[in-house]
Amino acid sequence: MILRFPEQLKNSWRRESEDFLGVVPESEQAKETLSLSQPASRCPSCGVPIKPWHNIPLISYVFLRGKCRACSTAISMQYPLVELLSGLATAFIVYQFGLSLMAGYCLIFTWVLISLTGIDFREQLLPDQITLPLLWLGLFANLSGIFVPLNEAVIGALGGYLSLWSVFWLFKLITGKEGMGYGDFKLLAALGAWMGWQMLPLIIILSTFVGALVGIVGLLMKTREKQVPMAFGPFLAMAGWIALIWGDKILGSYLSVFGL
């Protein structure tokens, strides 16, 4: 998903541009139909198809010692990290909520956020094809008030979008630069649709704090350049997941400090 879906989008945009301009594709690869299931997984370095028993999450990575069986090229650490994170998060959700409808929704929410995190980290892109269905699924879940009442979910979606939209234009008016992408607005709108408007301040504060901390540490350690933009989506996703699982407890603890 993280690697293939952006390539699928690029191929689609390329074909649309070629059709519009009347350009003939330069290679057979450009004509190849790419989907999430076809063609079968293959090494990005040598192109050799990966056998099913070499494609088992985590186990195959350890068995192959982190290298392609065909060309011995090192396999990106992103694969086992995503597999490990997905497995741990899935186990935690099932442990926390049991085999319930809420657990099912939480699992979908978790897997989508992991995918968006990986895509935005690699491509600085939050595809509408993922963020908008996530938003509508949140509203659908809250038709029956699984997480929050529907009116709070609708206000959360509107508030999530408009809050970052306002920050975007204020920053652009002051600096003449774009501080974030429209995908960030839509992701926060989706999070608001799932958890309601009450969780938006927590999500914004937590994501901004962690994002700023990571950015400062990166600059101090010289692992990133000052002028290179940093994806904000992963921090929104992380804050959103924390808010879904522990948001009520965090807000309760915060309010109790002030006797509210």
Where are these regions (language model features)?
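Alpha-helical membrane-inserting segments
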Residues: 2, 89, 93, 97, ...
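C-terminal domain-closing interface element
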Residues: 238-260
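Interfacial loop-to-transmembrane junctions
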Residues: 182-183, 217-242
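Membrane-proximal soluble regions of multi-pass membrane proteins
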Residues: 1-78, 232
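C-terminal ends of transmembrane helices
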Residues: 1-4, 65-70, 113-123, 166-178, ...
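Functional transmembrane core segments of multi-pass inner-membrane proteins
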Residues: 102-210, 252-260
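Conserved post-catalytic alpha-helical subdomain immediately downstream of the catalytic base
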Residues: 198-228
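Multi-pass membrane catalytic core of lipid/isoprenoid biosynthesis enzymes
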Residues: 47-106, 183-185, 189-190
